[in-house]
Amino acid sequence: MNYLSDLHTHTIVSGHAYTTLMENIDFCSKKGIKILGTSDHGPAMPGSPHYWYFGNLKVVPRIINDVIILKGCEANILDVDGNIDIPNNAMKNLDYMIASFHEPVFEPKSLEENTNAILNAIYKYDKLEILGHLGNPNYELDYDIIVKKAKENNIMIEINNSSLSGGSRIGSNVNCEKVALLCKKHGTKVILTSDAHINLKICDFSKSIELLNKIEMPKELIMNEPDKLIAHLKSKGRLQDL
């Protein structure tokens, strides 16, 4: 398995993570990790940076120490209309966005409202590439329609190792398996992520791989091989400088 890409990682800029961007890059370089996606929390999350931070990611070189850097954000879904907390003038400088629910920003609502919030975000934002930690048991969701719409819009579903390891969003395991099985059923692309808040966890996909092996997820749906991931993003007009 050549799963040497991780698009859900955090730096000290998120306010509750513990390594810098350069420390993350150096770790990846030493470990042979080929693609690092840096995706700090959007500004609506307590402790997170001003949106200028995301707009200014343009100053970060594309390749540092042989590691390809993808400039992203874990954007917060703000409301049922699917609005997120990254303005267009900052979004234009990003390679991708993850859209996620976080309890301090979006209080869990009904199944219909939670589902509509995600669907509306899918429809609104071209830079949305990944739906984050859908297995969170605090948010009831219609997984089937979300996975179908992700497939129709060529959006990846995250298989979040932190959720499965019990480090975050306790009780996500059952829902994560449901989501993964629906991705297999509908042919929706998935991406393994660490959700690392310290560099030692970058590309730790151990629990995610266990789950995908258990359900016999087709390898062609797993997007972590660097060449496959770059081809996917280029097919959507991204990464034209690679």
Language model feature labels by segment:
Residues 22-36, 59-62:
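Alpha-helical scaffold segments that flank or form the walls of functional sites
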Residues 41, 188-202:
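Short acidic/histidine-rich active-site segments
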Residues 15-19, 48-50, 140-147, 167-182, ...:
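Histidine/acidic-residue-rich catalytic or RNA/ligand-binding cores of hydrolases
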